[in-house]
């Protein structure tokens, strides 16, 4: 085992102890305005508590073991219609496999989905969705039995995608579970985009979970997919990316699997004791774990602390995965523009990284623009210098 040490190299920059002091959970969870001071909002997430006596229970068979609904979306709809100013909603998921999309609208109160199995994989929400689907295929896949109807709480979300006039639905409509609400919590369950290896290694964005709201918490959750597994994002009601604010998320004691950019988005997200497992089975190129698109004025993007990074046997030889790359979202026509284009921010610290990853050059060229990675190793460096990437490590161990 080898420990990474300051200052590293221009291809693999390492933070000093003093620099690393800034990259802690409280800093990531404190939201500030553009000037760094106004509109300060401090979030202090605690362990997820659930109500086992909740009236909304999802099970494989309605009427058995207290199940009131056969699908997760049915339970979400019923709970939102009957909330009657409840401060929060808990939805219990009995062990089973639930096939179908789950959409949670922006105006939902704090909502918790929790599995009652002994392990997170005892409760599975799954569907095969592909960004390359046509709108017609999307409608057939997501709404073949009228799961979404006008007047339903999340109808607008479905309709934004079902009514698209493009040839394909794109990444923004390819999520199995999609929440636009603040204060979403998920505990002890698994979400799978079941497209997996049924497609080739080209671009097939297939999101398991997408979150747009603020103060998102995942605990003992498994997210499984290939490209774009977890979209931890910030957007508006029209399903558009926004650049004037960001959301926060806390992912703890969880497992995330994928191949290309499989943790990505504009939110400020902390991954605490998360196992990231990179797979080669689809034959994809440009394999990266992270692809943040933090705005240049946002000091904090993604933080992975006390995490594990592993890969499958496809990386045991000369082929290696990358830890991540910046996503220069929105700059395909202009190229990277300092202080305008997103400049993804990420710190991986106090974590273990196995031999599946490129030790010499763990960061790839930016998505969208192919901007070459530029690490700042100057002794007087500004960690937010827009002329450089903001992808860092601290106190990690390279496993043999």
From Swiss-Prot:
Catalytic residues of the enzyme: 228, 261
Pfam families: Pectinesterase (PF01095)
Pathway connected to this protein: Glycan metabolism; pectin degradation; 2-dehydro-3-deoxy-D-gluconate from pectin: step 1/5
Binding site residues for substrate: 171, 205, 325, 327
Gene Ontology MF terms: pectinesterase activity
Site residues, Transition state stabilizer: 227
Keyword set, alphabetical order: Aspartyl esterase, Hydrolase
Annotated signal peptide: none
UniProt-listed PROSITE patterns: PECTINESTERASE_2 (PS00503)
Chain segments annotated as transmembrane: none
Documented EC number(s): 3.1.1.11
Catalytic function, reaction form: [(1->4)-alpha-D-galacturonosyl methyl ester](n) + n H2O = [(1->4)-alpha-D-galacturonosyl](n) + n methanol + n H(+)
Top-level taxon: Bacteria
EC class of the enzyme, as a word: hydrolase
Stated family: Belongs to the pectinesterase family.
Protein name in the entry: Pectinesterase B
Species of origin: Pectobacterium parmentieri
Organism ancestry: Bacteria, Pseudomonadati, Pseudomonadota, Gammaproteobacteria, Enterobacterales
